[in-house]
């Protein structure tokens, strides 16, 4: 299994709670840091990754996944992506097909871009895209709703045949907005389950930044990966970061 972090994040901050639970459930868990080249201000901050363009980041993920399959002696693996990580999984599947991937789980994936609570729309309207790129990185530009990258990625649909998708969104997402834009539509040969984290558990108020630490989100992930298909989903408070 490969875990894929999001923008301005790293593998530890993103999955410090989820990764051990997946390991205890019997998975071999792999992750890595990607997406930094020193060309933007955000990427200069220690521990901050995922700032470079999504096409190149997807290539990094494809290479890492191939290495994991080779070392594990596996023909297929599962992938879990948070935020940009979910979109990169789609990038890999679209470029390389779904033959090497079994199950996919995404948490607050920016699959269709984001308005960033309106900020991305404003930046585009006032012509601040170049400033955004210099400060926040190409990843921020690529994930704007209607960007060239997102338009090309979704031109032939959201999914690829042969892959089982579980897509988790949170009502309190302030980064991927509107939050339902994370949800996917199944194409031929694919299965999609779109899940709002708060359905059946109103006390979990996880936002974009905290949802990978939500016990309920972790349980949904384990169930989707068939690591825990019989247990009930935990319903516990999980606070937002913002």
Which residues make up each language-model segment?
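Serine-dependent carboxylesterase/thioesterase catalytic core
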Residues: 4-5, 29, 47, 55-154
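Extracellular/periplasmic catalytic domains that process cell-envelope and extracellular macromolecules
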Residues: 22-24, 71-72, 80-81, 96-100, ...
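Cap/lid segment of the alpha/beta-hydrolase catalytic domain
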Residues: 36-52
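Short aromatic-enriched loop/helix-cap "lid" or pocket-rim segments at secondary-structure transitions
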Residues: 41-44, 115-120, 177-181, 206
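Hydrophobic/aromatic beta-strand patches that form the interior of the parallel beta-sheet core
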Residues: 2, 30, 105, 166-168, ...
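Short, surface-exposed "cap/lid" segments of acyl-processing enzymes
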Residues: 1-38
